[in-house]
Design a protein with these regions (language model features):
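Extreme N-terminal basic, low-complexity initiation segments
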Residues: 1-9
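N-terminal beta-strand motif that seeds the catalytic metal site of vicinal oxygen chelate
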Residues: 9-38, 44, 88-92, 138-141
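Core segments of cupin and vicinal oxygen chelate
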Residues: 19-21, 28-71, 106, 112-122
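Vicinal oxygen chelate
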Residues: 32-34, 85, 90-130
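Active-site beta-strand termini and strand-to-loop segments that position acidic
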Residues: 58-62, 127-130, 140
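Short connector loops at helix/strand junctions that flank enzyme active sites
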Residues: 61-63, 83-87
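A short, acidic/glycine-rich surface segment
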Residues: 73-79
Length: 141
């Protein structure tokens, strides 16, 4: 295995893993309602929603970034409770926490755990998207 095949490049270039050329890497969320979930992530990423019957793809500058698939029986995680634990979450590292917080709240997020210390590199705040999937805004410099 070559050094190139063992590492993943950034989104700007091809992604090689064990000789496999991956054109796009997309996180997919299940949701009982596609519109609020895809609209939320399109707003967060400043992208557009490509709509199909039971699938929405959020693209940014024409590149697929997040998928939302219809899951009529989707039950939101109940974080931090363990009755319905999270299975995946995104960490979004932001330079301007107050602006990012205002944006995700306006798009329909809700706070699950407030930051203890809203200073750069010190903390993070946990939110849920409209379908209940946890994600974090991580404060950086």
């Amino acid at each position: 295995m070559t050094q190139q095949a063992a590492t993943m490049d950034t989104a700007d270039g091809p992604c090689f893993a064990h000789g496999m050329d991956i054109a796009h890497q997309v996180v997919v969320f299940d949701a009982a309602e596609l519109e609020p979930e895809s609209t939320f992530w399109a707003g967060v990423l400043e992208g557009e929603v490509d709509v199909e019957d039971d699938w929405h793809m959020i693209t940014v500058d024409g590149a697929p970034k997040v998928g939302v698939q219809l899951a009529p029986d989707h039950v939101a995680p109940d974080w931090p409770e363990e009755s319905r634990p999270q299975q995946i979450h995104l960490d979004l590292y932001v330079h301007d926490f107050p602006t990012a917080h205002e944006k995700v709240m306006a798009l329909g997020a809700r706070v699950l755990k407030e930051a203890k210390d809203a200073t750069p590199n010190a903390d993070f705040q946990v939110y849920a998207d409209p379908a209940g999937h946890p994600f974090c805004l991580c404060i950086i410099t």
